[in-house]
């Protein structure tokens, strides 16, 4: 009975903190974007907006449904976590190499030569973010949205302030690129700081196949 009550309280707390994170994060991002819009050109947002499409598609493949499989599966093991961790990193590296290789073609397609360098830099987000996917999944499994909220808000606020300073100093589109990278880096650092988890030196094909069939 006590366990049931404790779980309910934890679930309610998780829902509340999840709502706090959502609305607070939107408020922070909205405020920062309003100010940055007055400092940057529409073309700066346009370039980053085009690249966001490629990053989102890549991110979907990197995750591959394994995060949801971990969260939904009851009898998950440390081998499962480690397998997903290594899969995410390797897949992220593969997609980054693809973006790096085809960056000149994408830039040529949009008739924007400067996109080549921007793609190769902002694409690092894929690798950085892949390092903390499992950490976030573990916190979700623990229904610990309080820590997730603190991590997300802190990262968004700090990276946003840095982006604003860069925009004010005249760095243009690089303000948005650096803001994105710093946000991803801070998220990863904070996830590692709050959750002291390390993967095993093991990748299991059996675990991979089970999670793949579970998540598909």
For each predicted feature, which ranges?
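Hydrophobic core positions of alpha-helical segments in small-molecule transporters
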Residues: 17, 51, 83-87, 121-124, ...
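Helix-loop junctions at the membrane-solvent interface of multi-pass transporters
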Residues: 39-40, 101-105, 109-110, 165-170, ...
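Interhelical loop/hinge segments that connect adjacent transmembrane helices in multipass membrane
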Residues: 1-7, 11, 146, 189-216
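Alpha-helical transmembrane segments
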Residues: 23, 27, 117-121, 176
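Signature of the first transmembrane helix
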Residues: 7-66, 91-103, 155-164, 179-187, ...
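Transmembrane-helix boundary and interhelical linker motifs in polytopic inner-membrane proteins
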Residues: 2-12, 37-42, 56-89, 106-107, ...
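Alpha-helical transmembrane segments of multi-pass membrane proteins
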Residues: 57-61, 97, 101, 112-135, ...
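Alpha-helical transmembrane segments and their helix-entry boundary regions
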Residues: 14, 18, 45, 84, ...
